[in-house]
Regions:
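Alpha/beta-hydrolase-fold enzymes
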Residues: 22-101
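Conserved hydrolase catalytic core segment
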Residues: 1-37
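Active-site nucleophile elbow and catalytic-triad environment of alpha/beta-hydrolase enzymes
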Residues: 97-98, 113-133
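Short, conserved loop/helix-junction motifs that constitute active-site signature segments
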Residues: 134-138, 164-167
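Catalytic active-site module of serine/aspartate enzymes centered on a nucleophile-bearing elbow/loop
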Residues: 158-200
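Conserved alpha/beta-hydrolase "acid-adjacent" motif
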Residues: 150-159
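Substrate-recognition/cap regions that form aromatic- and gly/pro-loop-enriched pockets
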Residues: 130-134, 148, 171-174
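Short beta-strand/loop motif that positions the catalytic acidic residue
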Residues: 137, 143-145
C-alpha cells in the first residue's frame, strides 16, 4: 500500500502515476493529486517568508501552523488564556514553540525544498490529463479528506472522486470529522484507525 498524509499523499499520487501497477492500495490522506491555487498561494507566501525573514524557518512555520488548524481548534485548545510567565497569549507561546522546534530540526535548504515539492504536486504530464492517468492506476484508491481542512480542502477530493467514479470502479471517498483542520489526521488517530480498518 502507498499511504501518505499531506505532502506524503502528494508523493504517493506521483509514485502511483509513474508506476500504475506499483501498489494494491493508494491512500492519500489530507492531500490531492495537484497543488491547486490555494496551495500555490500559501507556498508562495512561505517562499517569500523564507527569502525575506530574519528568522525564516520559525516565521514560515508560524504561518504554516495557521493553515494546518482552524479557528475552532484554537478556541478549543487556548480559549484566549495567557502565559503569565511570558506575558503573552498561550496561542502565541504555542506558535513560537513550534517555530523554534522546527528550526532545530530543519535546515533552511531542506525547508525550501519541502515547500517547493508541496507547491509543485501535479501528476499531469506529457499532455495526459489527471483523469486518464488516474484511470490507468490499477490500485484501489481511497481518498481520505478532513471535513474542516483549510489547506487541502475536502472539496478538492470530492471533485476528484466525482470526476473518476464513473470511469474507475475501485475508487472510494472517506471523510474524517474533526475540528482540528489539516492536522486532524495526526490528532484524531482513533478515527483514522477506524477508517483504515474499513479498507484493510
Amino acid at each position: 500500500a502507498l499511504i501518505g498524509g499531506s505532502i506524503g499523499g502528494g508523493i504517493a499520487w506521483e509514485m502511483a502515476a509513474l508506476a500504475p501497477e506499483l501498489t494494491q492500495y493508494l491512500i492519500p490522506i489530507a492531500s490531492d493529486w495537484k497543488a491547486n491555487d490555494w496551495i500555490i498561494a500559501n507556498t508562495f507566501l512561505q517562499k517569500r517568508i523564507l527569502q525575506n525573514s530574519k528568522n525564516p524557518i520559525e516565521d514560515a512555520r508560524i504561518h504554516a501552523m495557521l493553515t494546518y488548524r482552524t479557528p475552532q481548534s484554537f478556541d478549543y485548545r487556548f480559549g484566549r488564556t495567557k502565559n503569565e510567565e511570558l506575558g503573552i497569549f498561550n496561542v502565541e507561546s504555542w506558535l513560537l514553540h513550534h517555530g523554534n522546534k522546527l528550526a532545530n530540526r530543519f535546515s533552511l535548504p531542506s525547508y525550501v525544498m519541502m515547500n517547493h515539492l508541496l507547491s509543485t504536486i501535479n501528476i499531469e504530464r506529457d499532455g495526459k490529463s489527471a483523469k486518464k492517468i488516474i484511470g490507468s492506476i490499477n490500485a484501489e484508491i481511497h481518498l481520505i479528506a478532513i471535513d474542516s481542512d483549510l489547506f487541502f480542502t475536502p472539496s478538492e477530493d470530492q471533485r476528484t472522486f466525482q470526476m473518476l467514479k464513473q470511469k474507475k470502479e475501485n475508487i472510494y471517498y472517506h471523510e474524517l470529522k474533526s475540528i482540528h483542520g489539516h492536522d486532524g489526521f495526526l490528532i484524531e488517530s482513533d478515527h483514522m484507525a477506524q477508517i483504515l480498518k474499513t479498507i484493510f
